[in-house]
């Protein structure tokens, strides 16, 4: 995966992630080799949109999940909602391999996967108004103050998400870092095209988001999980 410079400034964008490759299991390696051609999507050339109708072979409500980890949550949702299409973006190959294994095991035809910088894909390759929902669950909190600029949830990113959502489309975030949760609220409440479904500055119930092993482990340690659920206004300003 290449790192493309910003067309206007020529500068490399600030990354919200670090590629911690980790070791691939034999099953993950096999899945990447055999299943990627069917379920993996390459990033299009600069300025060209993803043709998701062609990629999925149909037109259906589309959910984008950014940073899906090992894909446990995404696979569960795709199995529960076969009427929806799920595009997952993740930079870590072991997680992509694990999701592809789940896709095969569960016979999920409504999942496609990309290994790319999700912020760049969102900005340059997703048509405006084309998404039914965007999900970001447990992103890197970058807890040190000097690293806060690396947090994915920033005003520019939220503005881009709002543009890609269809009217009535949702943005669902979750984190177990209280400081990041408050930061998310600050940024989201300032976006005029999004409305908090639970009221101003309110956190949301977990709703349809599956509880993952990672989350259950944190809850046993006493971590609190914060969900935020917003919808794009039907008549955005």
Swiss-Prot record:
PROSITE patterns: SAM_MT_TRMB. HAMAP family: tRNA_methyltr_TrmB. Catalyzes the formation of N(7)-methylguanine at position 46 (m7G46) in tRNA. One of its GO terms (molecular function) is tRNA (guanine(46)-N7)-methyltransferase activity. Its EC number is 2.1.1.33. The active site is at 140. InterPro entries: SAM-dependent_MTases_sf, tRNA_(Gua-N-7)_MeTrfase_Trmb, tRNA_methyltr_TrmB_bact. Keywords: Methyltransferase, S-adenosyl-L-methionine, Transferase, tRNA processing. Belongs to the class I-like SAM-binding methyltransferase superfamily. TrmB family. S-adenosyl-L-methionine binds at residues 65, 90, 117, 140. It catalyses: guanosine(46) in tRNA + S-adenosyl-L-methionine = N(7)-methylguanosine(46) in tRNA + S-adenosyl-L-homocysteine. The lineage of its organism: Bacteria, Pseudomonadati, Pseudomonadota, Gammaproteobacteria, Chromatiales. It comes from the Bacteria. Pfam families: Methyltransf_4. Residues 206-217 have a biased composition (Basic and acidic residues). Substrate binds at residues 144, 176, 212-215. Residues 197-217 are annotated as: Disordered. The keyword Methyltransferase applies. CDD domains: AdoMet_MTases (cd02440). GO terms for cellular component: tRNA methyltransferase complex. It comes from Alkalilimnicola ehrlichii (strain ATCC BAA-1101 / DSM 17681 / MLHE-1). Pathway: tRNA modification; N(7)-methylguanine-tRNA biosynthesis. It is an enzyme of class 2 (transferase). The gene is trmB. Disulfide bonds: none annotated. This is tRNA (guanine-N(7)-)-methyltransferase.
